[in-house]
């Protein structure tokens, strides 16, 4: 670190013979002025940063001095414009409470997409409208509207091109039912409000899809078991305690999760996949291995900036 205690260099083990090294420098105000990533001898990323008098980021440049992205702000200090090197400009609009109400993406050829949102008096989102233009200038508009109950819980979603979704809740504010068209999913919980089971009944076919959830003592989800042969009216809790056996033909949709002492997901097992995860001291996920193939996640603070696969390391 430097004299002010800011991190100037961070090293992460990639492979047995190769490290990832992140280097930082800072200006007199403590703002990050440069950031670089090296994997072994290979420089993967090198950026420099500029700020305005209020220490707001206004420019990011690459190692050649070319502008990668620039930012502008409104009188309230909110981001009003983002200009990318590829020519895409994004403008942002806000209401009197500084909530995002509009976003427009455009290139030199015109608007490519736009988004708007409105809010209820209590701050909950009432409606969203998105419009996307294709290369011929034809626009596709989609809307989403939301309805809430007196406790602020969402009770209905209405979206363009899909069936409405409605929700009900139990006395503990857990979701009790979700209905999409002719398909209703009911949820069961234990006394700690942890999800135990879902029953999805297709009213047109009377088919009942069941997912059973197994949790550890900390409330982490250890496993999900898919069972379609359980009748909808079955209340036998022995179904909930069903053993999970990977590879069992009856239970081939199982998912089994393992956690460490910090309740971080460290391993997920399915019939076809074995996925493991690693974390740093801040709790950020630093690595993922899928069936033996490793991917390393590179962070700048809390922002993921790069993923390096085994082949790219």
Give the residues covered by each predicted segment.
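Surface-exposed loop/turn segments flanking beta-strands in extracellular/periplasmic regions
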Residues: 7, 32, 57, 190-197
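Extracellular repeat-rich scaffold modules on cell surfaces
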Residues: 30-32, 213-230, 247-248, 252-264
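Short secondary-structure transition motifs
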Residues: 44, 77, 89-92, 96-105, ...
């Amino acid at each position: 670190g430097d004299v002010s205690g800011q991190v100037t260099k961070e090293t992460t083990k990639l492979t047995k013979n190769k490290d990832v090294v992140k280097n930082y420098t800072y200006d007199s105000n403590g703002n990050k002025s440069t950031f670089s990533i090296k994997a072994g001898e290979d420089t993967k990323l090198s950026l420099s940063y500029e700020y305005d008098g209020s220490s707001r980021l206004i420019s990011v440049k690459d190692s050649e001095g070319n502008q990668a992205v620039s930012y502008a702000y409104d009188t309230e200090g909110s981001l009003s414009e983002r200009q990318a090197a590829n020519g895409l400009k994004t403008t942002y609009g806000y209401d009197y409470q500084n909530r995002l109400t509009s976003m427009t993406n455009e290139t030199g050829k015109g608007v490519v997409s736009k988004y708007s949102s409105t809010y209820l008096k209590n701050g909950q989102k009432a409606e969203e409208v998105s419009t996307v233009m294709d290369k011929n200038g034809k626009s596709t508009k989609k809307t989403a509207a939301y309805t809430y109950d007196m406790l602020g819980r969402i009770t209905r979603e209405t979206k363009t091109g899909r069936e409405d979704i409605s929700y009900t809740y139990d006395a503990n504010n857990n979701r009790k039912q979700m209905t999409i068209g002719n398909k209703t999913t009911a949820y069961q919980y234990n006394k700690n409000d942890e999800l135990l089971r879902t029953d999805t009944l297709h009213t047109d076919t009377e088919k009942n899809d069941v997912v059973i959830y197994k949790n550890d003592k900390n409330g982490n989800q250890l496993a999900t078991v898919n069972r379609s042969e359980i009748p909808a009216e079955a209340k036998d809790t022995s179904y909930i305690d069903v053993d999970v056996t990977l590879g069992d033909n009856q239970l081939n949709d199982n998912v089994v999760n393992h956690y460490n002492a910090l309740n971080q997901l460290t391993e997920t097992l399915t019939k076809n996949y074995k996925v493991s995860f690693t974390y740093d001291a801040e709790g950020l996920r630093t690595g993922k291995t899928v069936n033996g193939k490793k991917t390393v996640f590179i962070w700048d603070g809390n922002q993921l900036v790069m993923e390096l696969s085994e082949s790219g390391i």
